[in-house]
Amino acid sequence: MKRSRVIVVGAGPVGVVAALASAQKGFSVILLEAEPAVDESPRAATTHPATLEMIDRLGLIGQFIAEGLVARYFQFWDRPTSTRICEFDHDLLRDETKFPFVVQTEQHKLANMGIARLREYTDADVRFNARATAVCQDGNSVTVTVEGIDGGERISGDYLIGADGGRSTVRKALDIEFEGYTWPERCVVLTTLNDFQRIFDCCYRNYFADPHEWVNLFKVAGDDLKGRWRAVFPTRVDETDEKVLADDSVHARLQGVFPLPQPYEVAHRNLYKTHQRVAVKFRVGRIFLGGDAAHVNNPIGGLGLNCGIHDAMELVDTLHQVVTGQADDSLLDRYERRRRPINIEFVQQTTVGNKKRLEEKEPKVRQANLDELRVIAGDPQRHKQFLMRTSLLESVRKAESIL
């Protein structure tokens, strides 16, 4: 019996998870990536408990944890006074999940280990230098036009998953509006080999509230597993790209986190725009959007990639139910019914709230925000409730309740 074929556009972590999950469900899979290799620039790393459960289902959890850092705690700080406001402990979730912690594993590691596993399947094809330029469909199939090193071709399948990022070719080809807005400031990410835990009493994940310049500070393992720290700052609206990335600006920002007598050792610097946008549709016929192709958000809280992985797992489970006769095609609409409102409620609202909390300028409102965090952290019931939301466990359970 001929297997149903799933075409996945985009070999970032969401596309790779979608492709691997599809192969494991018995689909024929082709994964298309425009670039010559997985993008290994510093990007998302924070992986929440709800997502760890899914990576466990893929059979990758052991390697995933080994290549990252386990982060049980996260902290909020008042940057102007260098005061720790409170600490949250994921161990309070031990009765809710087998993974009561976050794992800091860079996203390219997940993509690479997923591709390695995918290549073990005889009916899975991974193609780099394969840029999707157009898509079309009829009642029985979907076809993607691909430009590669050796020219162009048309590839057909039963379903197509567009996981090709915020500038998604698939989304644009379907003329799907990307509702929302772009923040006026950008984010600059500075990676340093200096160990902040040796400098002051922080943990692996830290959020610094500051009316002038908030900071996210977190540790990742690095490819050599020796550890390095990333600091994320907002730019000033009037700063040019050249000014933001210049050595004097880079070192001034890092020295502003904690002054050192010598310059920081900077391993990488990156600058990007941030958005809050959600596609008005996640499905058109046999074509689906997931990950950044469907939704983008600011990085505070580390929710975007996690939600994208949830998209991929939800979608593949739904496709499998349909092709195996457990449900008819009408079930495919459930993917959008679940994933779009969940993203709006748990990712868009939360990341906007996180940003406003860190950047608040009005003194009374700012103090009230910090006091509220202390109260939540000090109350075991509210502490756990807060973690259920930040860990995305609550979002997964709510999604499952949507019929």
Please give the residue ranges for each predicted region:
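Extreme N-terminal leader/targeting segments of oxidoreductases
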Residues: 1-6, 24-25
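Core beta-strand elements of the Rossmann-like FAD/NAD(P) dinucleotide-binding domain
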Residues: 2, 150-159
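Conserved mid-domain beta->alpha element of the FAD-binding
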Residues: 10-20, 26-28, 114, 162, ...
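Glycine-rich FAD pyrophosphate-binding loop
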Residues: 23-43
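Active-site-adjacent segment of FAD-dependent monooxygenases/related oxidoreductases
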Residues: 43, 48-117, 347
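Conserved FAD-binding catalytic core of PHBH/FMO-like flavoproteins
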Residues: 116, 139-141, 159, 163-274
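A conserved short coil-to-beta-strand element within the FAD-binding core of flavoproteins
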Residues: 128-142
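C-terminal helical "tail/cap" subdomain of flavin- and related membrane-associated enzymes
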Residues: 318-403
